[in-house]
UniProtKB/Swiss-Prot annotation:
Residue stretches in coiled coil: none
Family stated for the protein in its record: Belongs to the universal ribosomal protein uS7 family.
Entry protein name: Small ribosomal subunit protein uS7c
Any GO CC annotation of this UniProt entry: small ribosomal subunit
Quaternary structure note: Part of the 30S ribosomal subunit.
GO MF annotation terms: rRNA binding; structural constituent of ribosome
SUPFAM superfamilies cross-referenced by the UniProt entry: Ribosomal protein S7
Organism: Rhodomonas salina (Cryptomonas salina)
Length: 156
């Protein structure tokens, strides 16, 4: 084992336009091949599309979407006596937000459509309306945790 001290958790630097850590975390999720400017442009275009459609503040809508996709519990594999159990665990706030952003970007990439900004905007709007694949994924994770509630006492 390493004798070094554990590395300090670095918080995401807020993005330049909205001054939001959530937008910068989403930028990192969309980022491909180090093209951060392109990732930021996609997100800003998606937020503009959302603002045009709803007439409300796009950042508030993004925060609502992330809140509705964030899981409260998840299952983790735990090996006990030769068999593996799916043990339900509470999700910490930062991990929950990260999972929500991961699912939103994953399912927006899988959508059919022309531009990534449009696909991302549609996925965010669907998340706010509690439809779409990212919300379905959250429900799936919650169902798995509910089904394996009997193994909750194996929590570590």
């Amino acid at each position: 084992m390493s004798r070094r001290t554990t590395a300090k958790k670095r918080l995401a630097v807020p993005d330049p336009i909205y001054n939001s850590r959530l937008v910068s975390m989403l930028t990192v999720r969309i980022l491909q091949q180090g093209k951060k400017h392109l990732a930021q442009r996609i997100i800003y275009q998606a937020l503009d599309i959302i603002k045009e459609r709803t007439g409300e503040d796009a950042l508030n809508i993004l925060e609502t979407a992330v809140r509705k996709v964030t899981p409260l519990v998840e299952v983790k594999a735990r090996r006990i006596g030769g068999s593996t159990y799916q043990v339900p665990m509470e999700v910490r706030a930062f991990r929950g937000t990260n999972l929500a952003l991961r699912w939103i970007t994953k399912y927006s990439k899988e959508r059919s459509g022309k531009s990534m900004a449009m696909k991302l905007a549609n996925e965010i709007m669907d998340a706010v309306n509690e439809t779409g694949n990212s919300v379905r994924k959250r429900e799936e994770v919650h169902k798995m945790a509910e089904a394996n509630k009997a193994f909750a006492h194996y929590r570590f």
